[in-house]
Amino acid sequence: MSTENAVVISSSCHRYLKVGQNRGVSPRLLSPADAAALLRPTDTLGLGLGPANPHTFLNALSARDDWENLQIGGALVLGLFGLFTNPHVHYRAGFFGPAERYLRSVGADVQLVPAGFRQFEPVLRQFAPRVMAVQCARDADGNFNTSLHVGATFEELLRAGRDPERLLIVEVNPHLPVTTALEGYTTTIPAELVDVVIEGDQPVFELPEETATEVDETIADIAAGFIHPHATLQTGIGAIPTMVARHLAQREGGEYGIHSEMFTTGLWMLHQAGKVTNSHKSIFPGVSVTTFALGSSAMYEWMNNNPAVAFAPVDIVNDPTLIGRNRHFVSINGAISVDLYGQIVADSVAGRQISGVGGHEDFVAGAELDTQNVSLICLPATIEVNGVRQSRITAQLPLGSIVSTPRHHTAVIVTEFGAADLRGRTVSERAHLLAEIAHPQFRDELHLAAENLAH
């Protein structure tokens, strides 16, 4: 970022500027350390999810050791920062990733706030952090493009920018793409709302591509059979959704649309294969719609100033009523386990958090609003625990399990042994259909359990 449009404030005087004093003019350009010094020992800080993390700023905050009670609201931190291991720093996370799981394992105070992605915005508004910090790209007009993440924080960033009692800090990263907003919406933070700018140079996080197994490929092949040539797609994270996209990219025909909370490398592959036209969508036609993106550096480069992909707030992208208006909509997500009632566990193991609900339930619910649409929940039939094969399809969920998606939203479950279409089926019928796609080792006992299932 050039300093010609920023007011440079030295560390000797910036502490004495009132919050909001610089509003309406160019934002102050500070060093990361000076920006970090603007937070009080007891304070509240809000962060954007994942690719919106301001890495340089978080590293600068990590260098401070005078915290008394710093409360942080965020989700899916992409990196390990010493800040979060400080005993006086308390992190309220709406979604767990590898960093949150690691922090929990080393005794850091990281607490889950159970909420779907759409609920993050009201949760953050209630939290009302005094300081909001975000990583952005600088656009051609000198304003701040939220790049790979709009999500649930955009409105809170603007509120912080308009409030003279609050502080809005933007970290500019030259490696981030400038992305396009969905028509009728904005994903740009005006420069006059920003209090402080710092310069970052962190390489953009690339999501490692999971290696697909033969089981994953079989599941993906079965799932692809449910997808209409003019389908609008949503895919979650993981090897199986990526494999589904690859199957679609390689098979004959296909004029697909994209309406997906997360834009992934798999969806980019579909674009690259010429299989995405967005011409058959009944809402937001002509563009792929998303609210955040994680993938490869090549995907990010492709997204730069590319109008083929449009970003919008999560309350638009994840609205089930809007999702359901797409013709032949197919939602493809994973799960950890499912019981014979069709209850889905997708974000925890025995009550221990490993990820979050995200938009899982929104897209499952949206897909059920039209008989031409379908939600596919894909998972391997078994998992090995300490060398012992266990079924992921169980008669009942273990004590302490947390249901991510209730049975009344469940449509189709796919394993390597087939697909169980539960739509319109009775409790007993659903149970037997699920038993039939379990591993053969467990089918008899599951069918027996299905006979005795309460209904």
Regions found by a protein language model. Give the residues of each.
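Conserved alpha/beta enzyme-core scaffold
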Residues: A6-H455
